C-alpha cells in the first residue's frame, strides 16, 4: 500500500519480472483518516515509515491497521529509535537527523524515543510482544499483535 503514484512506479518496475504475479498493491493516502487499509493479511510490515509522521498521524495509521487485521496477524515495525542505540554517538546522530528531516521533509519527521512509539502503539489498540535491537546499523524491530 502506498500513494497512487508510487504504486504506478512499482507496477512499471516489476512488469514482466519473475515473481511479479505475487505482488499485490493497493493505492491510498494513509494520511487521510478515512482511507481504509485492506485486511486479511498474516503479517503487516512497516520499515522506516512511521518516523515520517506526527504522533497523531501514527496513531491514526496504526489504529486503522489494528481494525483491519485478524486476531493472529503480526505487525512488524522497524525503526531507528534514538534511545535504543548501542553507541552514544549513534543516538546523537539520530537526534540530529530528526532536526534535518523536520526542516527538510514535511515538518513532522523525527526519530522516535522508544517510549513515545510504544505509547502510540498501545493507543492504537496493539500490544508489543517483542523488541529486537541492533539490527543492521541500529534498527529496532518491534513485533506487535492486537490487544
PLM feature spans:
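Alpha-helical subdomain
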Residues: 1-147
